[in-house]
Design a protein with these regions (language model features):
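Transmembrane helical elements of multi-pass membrane transporters/channels
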Residues: 19-38, 140, 151, 174, ...
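Short runs within selected transmembrane alpha-helices of multi-pass transporters and secretion channels
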Residues: 72, 141-159, 167-175, 196-211, ...
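N-terminal transmembrane alpha-helices
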Residues: 8-45, 59-74, 78, 103-110, ...
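Small-residue hotspots at the loop-to-helix junctions and early N-terminal turns
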Residues: 48-59, 138, 197, 269-284, ...
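Hydrophobic transmembrane alpha-helices of multi-pass small-molecule transporters
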Residues: 63-66, 178-182, 208-212, 284-287, ...
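Short alpha-helical transmembrane segments in multi-pass integral membrane proteins
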Residues: 1-21, 79-144, 188-244, 300-367, ...
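Small-residue-rich hydrophobic transmembrane alpha-helices
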Residues: 51-111, 148-167, 274-338, 371-393
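Helix-terminus/linker motif at the lipid-water interface of multi-pass membrane proteins
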Residues: 29, 33-52, 121-128, 184-191, ...
Length: 442
């Protein structure tokens, strides 16, 4: 049985990280179901144009929510350090300050995307025939930004104190509800892409509001008292350092992907549809190592706060080996079953779309160990209060990816050049991150 709450400062290292990571993995699995359900229903029942529109919308939404996710992850890292060092009062103060800060940013972000939607679609070079579909989908899906903030904020708070089970439970209910509502809204009510978007937004509010109310009732140690509701400049500076830098790292990562999406869109509907389906499979495939990296980050943060550097070093060795094993297995599975996986989302008769997606998956899939290492590096530098290093690694990875994608796609390689740019970017960032770590040790 997986315990509800972990102290990662004692006990078996690998076992504890894995036990903490498992609910994160299941939770991310369910999170992926939101978009996979949309992709499957839209791709199978509404056609390639609708799939291309929803796929491009997903890339945009991932960028926007990454800003909030980074802020929530950063505030969670601050809380985790204070939890590890036993600073309960300061921890509650961090909850008060970070909640108001991120809630305000979420409201501003929501307003900006509504006002600038037409300009955003133009920048993404969305084909004219898809603009109406994308606009219909996005105008509804943007309503879920507040729900995304609520869920990610409270989920990261609970994970900071070692509880990864409760976020999983709320996400499970929400994901199942989303699948049911997707089928009802698209197949029964015939609401098209608007129905798929509405199903997702409603389900997001179920998980966001639900986990917020549950946390406030069941975890009093995280609920600010009246005396905690004040602005402490030093504590706020620490929260801002971790939150803003983590948000910058997350948003740079997804802005780079957004730029690549714009390039992909220029190749037409076939490549857009292939990319939309393949990215879902790709994200799903490396999800275990991403969540393992987040679990490792909490492990490092708690031990960093508790002043246990030797235990951190042992955890690095253990996490590196475990992540490598994950990646090898996942790489073999994706490369072997790329075509059947594409067939989940695309009608087998659309062979051109499937062929493009298979090529993408086999190039990326063969190199998953690169992103596995990168997720560990992101988690480590965030946990030891060096989020700026995570930003540098992200710029190296995504900068390389975007630059090479535009350069190589203009050669006879064409769209293959876009696919090849990804693992090259991972490798460069890994080399920088490992080199910096080794230099600091000497």
């Amino acid at each position: 049985m997986i315990p509800m709450q972990h102290s990662l400062t004692q006990g078996p290292i690998t076992k504890n990280i894995l036990l903490f990571a498992l609910p994160l993995m299941f939770g991310n699995l369910l999170q992926q179901m939101y978009n996979i359900a949309d992709t499957w229903v839209v791709g199978r029942f509404l056609g390639a144009d609708a799939l291309a529109a929803v796929g491009s919308s997903y890339t945009l939404m991932t960028f926007l929510t990454s800003i909030l996710l980074g802020l929530c992850m950063g505030s969670g890292a601050a809380v985790s350090m204070q939890y590890g060092s036993g600073e309960t009062e300061k921890m509650r103060q961090s909850v008060f300050q970070s909640f108001l800060l991120i809630a305000g940013i979420a409201l501003v972000l929501n307003l900006l995307v509504y006002l600038g939607l037409n300009g955003i679609l133009w920048l993404l070079r969305v084909p004219a025939e898809l603009c109406s579909l994308m606009k219909d989908y996005l105008l509804i899906i943007f309503l879920g930004i507040a729900a995304t903030f609520l869920y990610n904020y409270f989920a990261n708070l609970l994970r900071a104190i070692g509880n990864s089970v409760v976020p999983l439970a709320f996400l499970a209910v929400s994901a199942i509800l989303n699948v049911i509502l997707d089928l009802v809204c698209v197949l029964v009510l015939d609401w098209g892409v608007k129905g798929a978007a509405g199903a997702t937004v409603f389900s997001q509010y179920v998980s966001g509001v639900g986990i917020g109310l549950y946390t406030l009732k069941k975890f009093p140690q995280l609920c600010p008292k009246r005396t905690d509701c004040r602005w402490d400049r030093k504590n706020l500076a620490n929260i801002l350092n971790l939150s803003v830098m983590t948000s910058v790292q997350q948003s740079i990562m997804n802005f780079g992907i957004l730029m690549v999406q714009g390039l992909v869109n220029s190749f037409g509907t076939v490549i857009m549809a292939a990319f939309a389906a393949a990215v879902k499979i790709d994200s799903f495939a490396y999800m275990p190592v991403q969540d393992f990296g987040n679990a490792f980050s909490t492990y490092v943060a708690q031990n960093y706060g508790a002043g246990q550097p030797d235990r951190i070093k042992k955890g690095i060795r253990s996490a590196g080996l475990t992540s490598a094993m994950f990646c090898i297995v996942i790489s073999m599975l994706v490369c072997a079953f790329a075509a059947p996986l594409m067939g989940i989302f695309i009608d087998p008769a659309q062979t051109e779309i499937i062929a493009a997606g298979v090529q993408y998956l086999r190039i990326e899939g063969a190199c998953y160990i690169g992103i596995g290492v990168l997720f560990l590096l992101y988690g480590y530098y965030r946990a030891v209060n060096q989020p700026g290093m995570s930003v540098i690694l992200t710029i190296a990875s995504l900068g390389t990816r975007v630059a090479l994608a535009y350069l190589l796609s203009a050669t006879p390689l064409g769209v293959t050049g876009i696919w090849l740019s990804v693992p090259i970017g991972w490798a460069l960032a890994d080399a920088i991150g490992i080199g910096y770590y080794l230099k600091k040790r000497t």
